[in-house]
Amino acid sequence: MRECISIHIGQAGIQVGNACWELYCLEHGIQPDGQMPSDKTVGGGDDAFNTFFSETGAGKHVPRAVFVDLEPTVIDEVRTGAYRQLFHPEQLISGKEDAANNFARGHYTIGKEIVDLCLDRIRKLADNCTGLQGFLVFNAVGGGTGSGLGSLLLERLSVDYGKKSKLGFTVYPSPQVSTSVVEPYNSVLSTHSLLEHTDVAVLLDNEAIYDICRRSLDIERPTYTNLNRLVSQVISSLTASLRFDGALNVDVTEFQTNLVPYPRIHFMLSSYAPVISAEKAYHEQLSVAEITNSAFEPSSMMAKCDPRHGKYMACCLMYRGDVVPKDVNAAVASIKTKRTIQFVDWCPTGFKCGINYQPPTVVPGGDLAKVQRAVCMISNSTSVAEVFSRIDHKFDLMYAKRAFIHWYVGEGMEEGEFSEAREDLAALEKDYEEVGAESAEGDEGEDDEY
């Protein structure tokens, strides 16, 4: 078996995690108490869903997941929520005082008290696996726990499980909407370690997802629940091929191989289609070509950056539902002819496709319509650099005045760590610029842009 362990860190990680596990359970027909009526073999570890769930002797299915937060309120919602019986109490780890939006607290003072306990729980889950494939890490880099404890855990995982792949689903600060003043600091410090310790990171950004909910689902005032349900569809589509049998299955290491041209260039954009409300879906025929085109629309991207400003290096299309390879090939061929979708010239093929016959599931009472087929796109585009340059700019404005720095230094950080992290990100922006320009002397003098 190729098992995956999910690690949910901080408020964002946990709430996205809740949405994901709710969806997984619905997809597999697992009840909130962990029973699965359709599974006839008790304790049989050979079903595809065992990559994400372990099975007890009593026939209960337990998620291979750990939830960690430095303060209890968010985890208490899991402990009292609809799926409280699904998780083993030891999988829910909470501390007493939170990181107070401070990377240094999450990474040094308070985080280090809880990190050994987390690793211990993760070790128990890993011992339960016959062939651990890797980790899915969910966090946000704007707060204190997601950024600080998140990086600390990633660093320790690299030491303990060197070769296992780590896929990050990371919520980045939005251009306009901000949840804390020191977001730029936390993000830069955290990205510095994400660069080294994750193999693929999928960037998500609340503002972009708000806009998708508003525009495509006609939700006037989207809540985090609306956002997370949309994100969970993306993550479910990515992991569907690990959990179901399909025609073209994709495994976690395959993402890495196909999407990451250079180790540092591993920050991905994601999009999902069709995002459509039930009222509209009734009147629309969503063909493979249509959903593929809409997945490439700049407005479908789940991070605020415009892929038209950069070039694609690679792109992974995960279809699910009623899709045959012939339609996929036709859709991809038509994408390649579009002038607006540009690939770097050193990557001529650029597409990796997966097909899974399990149609997308929707959460009852959710916002998305039940559709026959859907596609999730994960792409590596040089336009991601916009996300970093935006954060770097905000970081520079604050750091020039050394604003708020004393909170970090007071928790045992050194000022040098700030400049080191900032230089690392400057190098990353430079890397992206070079990758986009690294072409042979191209036609139409495209090199003049830089």
Curated annotation (Swiss-Prot):
Swiss-Prot/TrEMBL GO biological process terms: microtubule cytoskeleton organization; mitotic cell cycle
The protein's enzyme class: hydrolase
PTM entry text: Undergoes a tyrosination/detyrosination cycle, the cyclic removal and re-addition of a C-terminal tyrosine residue by the enzymes tubulin tyrosine carboxypeptidase (TTCP) and tubulin tyrosine ligase (TTL), respectively. Acetylation of alpha chains at Lys-40 stabilizes microtubules and affects affinity and processivity of microtubule motors. This modification has a role in multiple cellular functions, ranging from cell motility, cell cycle progression or cell differentiation to intracellular trafficking and signaling.
Matches recorded under SUPFAM superfamilies: Tubulin C-terminal domain-like, Tubulin nucleotide-binding domain-like
EC number(s) stated in the UniProt entry for this protein: 3.6.5.-
Subunit structure: Dimer of alpha and beta chains. A typical microtubule is a hollow water-filled tube with an outer diameter of 25 nm and an inner diameter of 15 nM. Alpha-beta heterodimers associate head-to-tail to form protofilaments running lengthwise along the microtubule wall with the beta-tubulin subunit facing the microtubule plus end conferring a structural polarity. Microtubules usually have 13 protofilaments but different protofilament numbers can be found in some organisms and specialized cells.
Stated role: Tubulin is the major constituent of microtubules, a cylinder consisting of laterally associated linear protofilaments composed of alpha- and beta-tubulin heterodimers. Microtubules grow by the addition of GTP-tubulin dimers to the microtubule end, where a stabilizing cap forms. Below the cap, tubulin dimers are in GDP-bound state, owing to GTPase activity of alpha-tubulin.
Name of the protein in question: Tubulin alpha-2 chain
Species the sequence originates in: Gossypium hirsutum (Upland cotton)
